[in-house]
Amino acid sequence: MHTPIISETVQPKTAGLIVLGKASAETRGLSQGVEPDIGQTYFEESRINQD
């Protein structure tokens, strides 16, 4: 009996999660093994943008 309530609550979030999931899957594919560098790259880019 709980299933309809759960699916109603989760469904809108699921649509967002699917989009996020696709985006993060692409990101993981592009930067596999490079994830530690992402933060540094962002930091360097924001430093460049400030100058």
Curated annotation (Swiss-Prot):
GO biological process per UniProt: defense response to bacterium
Cross-link (Isoaspartyl glycine isopeptide (Gly-Asp)): 29-37
Site (Important for stabilization of the lasso structure): 42-43
Source organism superkingdom: Bacteria
Record annotation: effect of changing residue 42 to W: No change in thermostability
Reported modifications of this chain: This lasso peptide is probably hydrolyzed to a linear form by the isopeptidase AtxE1, in vivo.
Prodomain positions: 1-28
Annotated consequence of substituting residue 43 to A: Loss of Astexin-1 production. No change in thermostability
Swiss-Prot/TrEMBL keywords: Antibiotic, Antimicrobial, Isopeptide bond
Effect of residue 47 to W: No change in thermostability
Thermal behavior of activity: Irreversibly unfolds upon heat treatment. Between 50 and 65 degrees Celsius, the protein shows an intermediate fold. At more than 65 degrees Celsius, the protein is completely unfolded.
Effect of residue 43 to W: Gain in thermostability
Function noted in UniProt: Shows weak antimicrobial activity against its phylogenetic relative Caulobacter crescentus. Does not show activity against other bacteria tested (E.coli, Vibrio sp, Burkhoderia thailandensis, and Salmonella newport).
Free-text note on domains in this protein's UniProt record: Is composed of a ring composed by 9 residues, a loop and a C-terminal tail. The peptide is threaded when the C-terminal tail is inserted throught the isopeptide-bonded ring.
Protein name: Astexin-1
Taxonomic source organism: Asticcacaulis excentricus (strain ATCC 15261 / DSM 4724 / KCTC 12464 / NCIMB 9791 / VKM B-1370 / CB 48)
